[in-house]
Amino acid sequence: MTMRASLAIENFLEMMSAERGAAQNTLESYRRDLEAAAEELAAKGVNLAEAETGHIRMTLDTMAAQGFAPTSQARRLSALRQFFRFLYSEGFRQDDPTGILYAPKKQKPLPKIMSVENVGKLLDRAALEANEAAEPGERIKALRLHALLETLYATGLRVSELVGLPVTVARTDHRFLLVRGKGSKDRMVPLSRKARDALQKFLTLRDSLPGSDDNPWLFPAFSESGHLARQVFARELKGLAARAGLAASSASPHVLRHAFASHLLQNGADLRTVQQLLGHADISTTQIYTHVLEERLHKLVSEHHPLAD
């Protein structure tokens, strides 16, 4: 590391400490990142304080090639950005070489996926409670929860789409639901026989309630919107999961939406079809499920290739 780079780093850290009150851990983190970049560039004959955009990009590319996480790369760029802004503000440079660089995006965590077995436990418990509930108030809630779950797992709707369904969608025995999704875009999603049956049982009881004719929502409630709040559904789902012997934290409407997509892919559906069913405008959003396809292909080769282990 050249003396000039070393001096520039020390001046920067002194400013961060004296003028901005940076914590010791922050200063040490800045030092590690800046000295690592300086040493790498010095090995190529480049002074960090005089580095250009291409040099900075090269250090980030090296980190990526060495397997550093996107968060580590972003932290390195943040330190360099602060460093060069300091040099610019102090008149040591006429530009900021990091100005047009972007931090690498953090990898999206894989969605939580509930197994087919556990989804089955949830649905079986919901059906049991719907059949056994005797008190009118409990019965309508149990039938509603069963209808919600069967419909969600059959269609993969967003929770906002599900609780906001108009009652007209359940007035027929059609095998498809017309759903209005994000951006007011309509899509057709198939509805299983079990989901249709659960909806009809709920609808029969719903229609017998006073004032039901005046409410346009399939799942009416005393709320600002007039329909069931998604938070209420999520809370009831967690309670059901606990009663089914599952961890309450493992169950949510979003987890069941992911289960719908993942189980379809595991059983042979293609990514484009799942994209359409989920209502994703861009295939890149659906690509979080590619790990499911990879697992399916690996299993396929393992089971059918003559030389597989």
Swiss-Prot record:
Keywords: Cell cycle, Cell division, Chromosome partition, Cytoplasm, DNA integration, DNA recombination, DNA-binding. GO terms for cellular component: cytoplasm. It is found in: Cytoplasm. Residues 109-302 form the Tyr recombinase domain. GO terms for biological process: cell division; chromosome segregation; DNA transposition. It holds the Pfam family Phage_int_SAM_1. Residues 3-88 form the Core-binding (CB) domain. It comes from the Bacteria. Site-specific tyrosine recombinase, which acts by catalyzing the cutting and rejoining of the recombining DNA molecules. The XerC-XerD complex is essential to convert dimers of the bacterial chromosome into monomers to permit their segregation at cell division. It also contributes to the segregational stability of plasmids. Belongs to the 'phage' integrase family. XerD subfamily. This is Tyrosine recombinase XerD. It comes from Brucella abortus (strain 2308). The lineage of its organism: Bacteria, Pseudomonadati, Pseudomonadota, Alphaproteobacteria, Hyphomicrobiales.
